[in-house]
Amino acid sequence: MKMKLLGIILLVSFPFVLGFAGIPIEEGENSVEVGEVERSCINVGDFCDGKKDDCQCCRDNAFCSCSVIFGYKTNCRCEVGTTATSYGICMAKHKCGRQTTCTKPCLSKRCKKNHG
């Protein structure tokens, strides 16, 4: 009796296990396979590839920032540069092929005096 009950439990739970394991289950002719859509750029806060350039990050002043542990880049994410670095990052992104609008930061005393 125990073996019969075990067989029924396994038979009922098998589709659930396959679903959680990520194995696609085809159900007839109209089964749809969902694929990952490739994005042209990565949003701020999302993971990026530390081996690629900063063009992978969407915003004009965003760059791929990584933690370095024992010489290896890990936990790379797209981050926004500081006021001091944003303009340089934006200017470097002109090579990415996207239209970038870079506004020079107001850092000097003279600039701050004139622009509030």
UniProtKB/Swiss-Prot annotation:
Cell location: Secreted
**Signal sequence extent:** 1-19
Query: Which Cys-Cys disulfides exist here?
Result: 41-58, 48-64, 55-90, 57-78, 66-76, 96-102, 106-111
> Which keywords does UniProt give here?
Amidation, Calcium channel impairing toxin, Disulfide bond, Ion channel impairing toxin, Knottin, Neurotoxin, Secreted, Signal, Toxin, Voltage-gated calcium channel impairing toxin
- Please state the biotechnological applications recorded for this protein: Could be used as a diagnostic tool for the autoimmune disease Lambert-Eaton myasthenic syndrome.
Query: Please, which domain of life does this record's source organism belong to?
Result: Eukaryota
Would you tell me the Gene Ontology cellular component terms?
extracellular region
Query: Which residues lie in the propeptide?
Result: 20-38
Q: Which residues carry this modification: Histidine amide?
A: 115
Query: Which InterPro entries does this chain map to?
Result: Omega-agatoxin_II/III_CS, Toxin_34
A Pfam family hit: Toxin_34
Q: Name one GO molecular function term.
A: toxin activity
Q: In which tissues is it expressed?
A: Expressed by the venom gland.
What the protein does comes down to: This toxin is a potent and practically irreversible antagonist of both Cav2.1/CACNA1A and Cav2.2/CACNA1B calcium channels, while it displays a partial and rapidly reversible block of Cav2.3/CACNA1E calcium channels and no effect on Cav3/CACNA1 calcium channels. Inhibits glutamate uptake from rat brain synaptosomes by an interaction between cysteines from both glutamate transporter and toxin. Blocks potassium-induced exocytosis of synaptic vesicles in brain cortical synaptosomes (IC(50)=1.1 nM).
Q: What is known of its domains?
A: The presence of a 'disulfide through disulfide knot' structurally defines this protein as a knottin.
Q: What is this protein called?
A: Omega-ctenitoxin-Pn3a
Q: Which organism is it from?
A: Phoneutria nigriventer
| Highest classification ranks of the organism | Eukaryota, Metazoa, Ecdysozoa, Arthropoda, Chelicerata
